[in-house]
Amino acid sequence: MSEIRLYVSTTESQAEQILDLLTEVFGEEDFAIGTTEVDEKRDIWEASVYMMAEDEAQVRSRVETALKSAFPDAQLLREVIPDVDWVVKSLEGLKPVRAGRFLVHGSHDREKVRPGDIAIEIDAGQAFGTGHHGTTAGCLEVIDRVVRSRRVRNALDLGTGSGVLAIAVRKLKNMPVLATDIDPIATRVAAENVRRNGIASGIVTRTAPGFHSTAFSEHGPFDLIIANILARPLIRMAPQLAAHLAPGGSVILSGILAAQRWKVIAAYSGARLRHVRTIWRNGWVTIHFDRP
């Protein structure tokens, strides 16, 4: 069944106001909500809500009712989202993805790497994370900022999947990285991708559910912790994750729907971390915290 995007094309300021309105309307329901910049020079942004086709009628009715009272001149537009599974899609269909200075590409696109690119080679396979999903791309952008601007001597990639984020950290800076996942297939795939990218000596991969492994005490505490999983486990693990963060360290979290962001921020603020920034990509958010 197709996914539908209902959106309003407007200015950045109004897009953020509409986003707040949509968040109030849908609360903790599983509808992705977000804003996207379309044209920087002309200040064109889109505020969007995503749903499956079967939910469109009721979502449209609720959005139109909310807009009518708060933004009567707003025009609600519609787009059908192509049904694409990037993990199992054929290699020929996967285009290189740029996120900050990173270029994530498959083995079939090596010739597209340009001078100055930080290239990460990941082929589609059994483990999630090829750079095409908004959560992965958002993490890559924040990783680039954090490693460039802060003192980072070691890192943890929790829920590593394909290993793309661990590889990104290691390619930015020569430091030890621990990459863990609950799924042994993902751990094996991550190790293979680490070797493929020529940095096997700098990344340790381990199969571990949550923080239940001696690897965390052996390699931590960490100056940087990245966890691109889901909002509920992130909220549940907030105290444990914060306990493994070194003084002055940074945390990058994703796998979070826009409507879920406030609960995640509250959980990590409660763990005495400071919210630094939130970035948006296609209805998903990536949140950066630090320990003051």
UniProtKB/Swiss-Prot annotation:
InterPro entries: Ribosomal_L11_MeTrfase_PrmA, Ribosomal_PrmA_MeTrfase, SAM-dependent_MTases_sf
Principal location class: cytoplasm
E.C. designation(s): 2.1.1.-
Keyword Cytoplasm on entry: yes
Entry's Gene Ontology BP terms: methylation
Gene3D superfamilies referenced in this protein's UniProt entry, alphabetically: Vaccinia Virus protein VP39 (3.40.50.150)
Residues forming coiled coils: none
Compartment list: Cytoplasm
GO cellular component, one term: cytoplasm
Entry keyword annotation includes Kinase: no
CDD domains recorded: AdoMet_MTases (cd02440)
Recorded catalytic activity of this chain's protein: L-lysyl-[protein] + 3 S-adenosyl-L-methionine = N(6),N(6),N(6)-trimethyl-L-lysyl-[protein] + 3 S-adenosyl-L-homocysteine + 3 H(+)
Broad enzyme group: transferase
Pfam families from the UniProt entry: PrmA
Binding positions for S-adenosyl-L-methionine per the UniProt entry: 136, 159, 181, 228
Keyword terms, alphabetized: Cytoplasm, Methyltransferase, S-adenosyl-L-methionine, Transferase
GO molecular function annotations of the record: protein-lysine N-methyltransferase activity
Function as written in the Swiss-Prot or TrEMBL entry: Methylates ribosomal protein L11.
Family membership noted in the UniProt record: Belongs to the methyltransferase superfamily. PrmA family.
Protein name per Swiss-Prot or TrEMBL: Ribosomal protein L11 methyltransferase
Organism: Rhizobium etli (strain ATCC 51251 / DSM 11541 / JCM 21823 / NBRC 15573 / CFN 42)
